[in-house]
């Protein structure tokens, strides 16, 4: 999720504190979203797979964020296209990964849910940070 861009690195006394905070926040948010999905749609969670899957979400988040950082300073119209593409790609990756921790979950429904969550967080990103 692109919420990590909303946290300014200069608000921490050291870079390791910043990284620890962002990783913790990323894990907590993604784990909460996965549990919320399972409660709302009545899908059983595989307890043994939950922690490894949610930890992999952090890696997926940071891969997406690093991809987004490559495009800082591009024109706004192109930035929106790239941001939308990253939302879709990350949503598909998160859906595939989260299906490993859920019993009988629809991958299509998971993909739509994660893409919607990414679009919402990207809207926040564009509202607070913007695209140049």
Curated annotation (Swiss-Prot):
A GO cellular component entry from the record: plasma membrane
Membrane topology of the entry: Multi-pass membrane protein
Claim: Glycosyltransferase is one of the keywords in the record: no
Superkingdom to which the source organism belongs: Archaea
Transmembrane portions of the chain: 15-37, 49-71, 81-103, 110-129
Location of this chain's protein in the cell: Cell membrane
Keywords linked to the UniProt accession: Cell membrane, Membrane, Transmembrane, Transmembrane helix
Annotated protein name in UniProt: Uncharacterized protein AF_2164
């Amino acid at each position: 999720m692109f919420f990590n861009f909303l946290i300014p690195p200069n608000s921490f006394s050291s870079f390791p504190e910043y990284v620890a905070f962002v990783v913790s926040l990323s894990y907590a948010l993604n784990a909460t979203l996965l549990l919320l999905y399972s409660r709302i749609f009545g899908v059983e969670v595989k307890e043994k797979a939950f922690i490894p899957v949610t930890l992999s979400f952090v890696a997926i988040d940071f891969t997406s964020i690093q991809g987004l950082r490559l495009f800082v300073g591009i024109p706004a119209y192109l930035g929106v296209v790239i941001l939308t593409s990253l939302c879709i790609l990350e949503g598909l990756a998160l859906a595939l990964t989260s299906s490993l921790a859920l019993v009988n979950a629809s991958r299509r429904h998971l993909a739509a849910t994660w893409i919607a969550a990414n679009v919402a967080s990207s809207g926040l990103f564009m509202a607070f940070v913007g695209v140049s």
